[in-house]
Amino acid sequence: MSSHEREEELRKRLRLIHLLHQTIDSYPTGPGTANQRRQRRRRWRRRWQQLLALADRIYSFPDPPTDTPLDLAIQQLQNLAIESIPDPPTNTPEALCDPTKDSRSPQD
């Protein structure tokens, strides 16, 4: 993988993490009882921790190998070519045509 491809892959990952970050609501504020505010903060903290764990997995996910066995198999299949198949024979072998000669009977 060239350095340009690696940089592009890193940019994709960072854009995905940035998009995930934008989907999380901001830190909760607002009216409500102390218990309601506490519950909102707990839910927000759980979502934030999930986002951090997901971002870590996205960022640290290894690059796919360029020459996996599947890629090699696909390349080999692409190199195959169908050749012309010869016409079948028009005459039948005599062993198949002669009904008196039984090929299953033991030879004397």
Curated annotation (Swiss-Prot):
One of its GO terms (molecular function) is DNA-binding transcription factor activity. A motif (Nuclear export signal) lies at residues 70-82. It is found in: Host nucleus, Host nucleolus; Host cytoplasm. Residues 16-25 are annotated as: Homomultimerization. One of its GO terms (biological process) is mRNA transport. Pfam families: REV (PF00424). A motif (Nuclear localization signal and RNA-binding (RRE)) lies at residues 33-49. InterPro entries: REV_protein. Residues 83-108 are annotated as: Disordered. Residues 99-108 have a biased composition (Basic and acidic residues). One of its GO terms (cellular component) is host cell nucleolus. The keyword Transport applies. The keyword Transport applies. Keywords: Host cytoplasm, Host nucleus, mRNA transport, RNA-binding, Transport. Its main location: host cell. Homomultimer; when bound to the RRE. Multimeric assembly is essential for activity. Escorts unspliced or incompletely spliced viral pre-mRNAs (late transcripts) out of the nucleus of infected cells. These pre-mRNAs carry a recognition sequence called Rev responsive element (RRE) located in the env gene, that is not present in fully spliced viral mRNAs (early transcripts). This function is essential since most viral proteins are translated from unspliced or partially spliced pre-mRNAs which cannot exit the nucleus by the pathway used by fully processed cellular mRNAs. The RNA-binding motif binds to the RRE, a stem-and-loop structure present in incompletely spliced viral pre-mRNAs. This region also contains the NLS which mediates nuclear localization. These overlapping functions prevent Rev bound to RRE from undesirable return to the nucleus. When Rev binds the RRE, the NLS becomes masked while the NES remains accessible. This is Protein Rev. It comes from Simian immunodeficiency virus (isolate K78) (SIV-mac). The gene is rev.
